[in-house]
């Protein structure tokens, strides 16, 4: 397919002719698209279409599994992440990820946030405390945990744990934040808080979200990509994708006739 371009501005992430394999299985086929900076881009599509796989390629999580490989280009500010010789840990500091299930570390709320910061920066105690508070405020969690920072992160509710994970991700000040179905295990109230947070975060970060909830994609995202069986079927402004899709396959999925 041709490269999907949605804006004339320079993209934060440019994917060019990306193919991905699980062993011999061809999971992503010739994906090309440009993800705009300081916007929320949502990936939708049926289970197994390649949404989460693509997300994991963005910060090379797949390299943890030797049978998986990627071919093509993923450019972050013009640098191909797939061939970069930089430390992968530094890459993942720039391209943070929050997973479907909340994964607080087995440590205090404070240390959950401070852990990553200590890996990449040498801050004095005051600056570290300020960074932790800043991240928790950004994640709309400070007011709920400021008096119990020494308690275990696992003591929080599911929605609070997910916001803790988001705070942990942004504490190291990444440029891109990847969210893999961040609300799938949460109740409606917690989901609403996460959605509000996603909308606010784009002022500081480029946000990419995978979701099965099409209403969530419509509410939160500026751009939407529809994927099916490893192919990028359509990519454009969210309003256009939902109300004036150019492909029948996209319309069928969004209207519930397929999926």
Swiss-Prot record:
Q: In which organism is this protein found?
A: Albidiferax ferrireducens (strain ATCC BAA-621 / DSM 15236 / T118) (Rhodoferax ferrireducens)
Gene encoding the protein: pstB
Where does the record say this protein resides?
A: Cell inner membrane
Q: What is its EC number?
A: 7.3.2.1
Superkingdom field? Bacteria
State the protein's name.
Answer: Phosphate import ATP-binding protein PstB
Q: How does it sit in the membrane?
A: Peripheral membrane protein
Sites where the protein binds ATP: 45-52
- The ABC transporter domain covers 13-254
GO biological process terms, semicolon-separated: phosphate ion transmembrane transport
Q: Which reaction does it catalyse?
A: phosphate(out) + ATP + H2O = ADP + 2 phosphate(in) + H(+)
């Amino acid at each position: 397919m041709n490269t999907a371009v949605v804006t004339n501005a320079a993209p934060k992430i440019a994917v060019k002719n990306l193919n991905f394999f699980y062993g011999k299985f061809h999971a992503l086929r010739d994906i090309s698209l440009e993800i705009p900076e300081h916007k929320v881009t949502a990936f939708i599509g049926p289970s197994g279409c390649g949404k989460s796989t693509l997300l994991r390629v963005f910060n090379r999580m797949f390299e943890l599994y030797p049978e998986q490989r990627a071919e093509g280009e993923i450019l972050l500010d013009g640098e191909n992440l797939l061939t970069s010789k930089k430390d992968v840990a530094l890459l993942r500091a720039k391209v943070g990820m929050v997973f479907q299930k909340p994964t607080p570390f087995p440590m205090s709320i404070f240390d959950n946030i401070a852990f990553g910061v200590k890996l990449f920066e040498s801050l004095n105690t005051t600056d570290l405390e300020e960074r932790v508070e800043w991240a928790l405020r950004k994640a709309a969690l400070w007011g709920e945990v400021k008096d119990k920072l020494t308690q275990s992160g696992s003591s929080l509710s599911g929605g609070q744990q997910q916001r803790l994970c988001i705070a942990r991700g942004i504490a190291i000040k990444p440029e891109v934040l990847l969210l893999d179905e961040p609300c799938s295990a949460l109740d409606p109230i917690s989901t609403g808080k996460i959605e509000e947070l996603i909308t606010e975060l784009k002022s500081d970060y480029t946000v990419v979200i995978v979701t099965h909830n099409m209403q969530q994609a419509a509410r939160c995202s500026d751009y939407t990509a529809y994927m099916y069986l490893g192919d990028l079927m359509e990519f454009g402004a969210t309003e256009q994708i939902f109300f004036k899709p150019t492909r029948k396959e996209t319309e069928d999925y969004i209207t519930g006739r397929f999926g």
